[in-house]
Design a protein with these regions (language model features):
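Conserved binding/recognition cores within well-folded domains
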Residues: 1-83
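Flexible domain-boundary/linker segments
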Residues: 35, 65, 87-90, 102
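C-terminal structural segments of small proteins and small subunits
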Residues: 77-98
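Inter-domain helical "communication" segments and dimerization helices
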Residues: 1-3, 96, 101-105
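Generic solvent-exposed, charged/amphipathic alpha-helical segments
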Residues: 46-49, 95, 99
Length: 105
């Protein structure tokens, strides 16, 4: 579990149920894509990344993925397919490191 405190609000999230975080166009807004639900947080990816462990990887400026929920990586098209069939983009400079991390897991 991870706890986020934003002003008066506390949000508890089960890290294992999170597939990825996605930055929205609005400043300091992030969608948490979960196995069961999606919620919007008033935070930055950097704020979230600092609270998470090694099971999450920032694969693109707009995405922070849960490595345990990755089903497949299409290296040619730089697409991550998650266990729930959602997809994320992998930044070109992040692809090789992500593949190394997955091979070690």
């Amino acid at each position: 579990m991870i706890n986020f405190k934003f002003g008066e609000n506390n949000v508890k999230l089960d890290c294992e149920k999170i597939t990825f975080f996605e930055k929205l166009d609005e400043k300091k807004k992030v969608i948490v894509h979960g196995v069961d639900e999606e919620i919007i947080l008033n935070a930055t990816l950097r704020d979230i990344e600092e609270k998470l462990g090694k099971n999450f990887y920032k694969c693109h400026k707009n995405f922070l993925v849960n490595i345990k929920n990755i089903a497949d990586v299409d290296a040619e098209n730089r697409i991550i397919k998650m266990n729930n069939n959602d997809q994320c983009i992998v930044g070109e400079r992040h692809l090789n490191k992500l593949l190394r991390i997955l091979n070690e897991a």
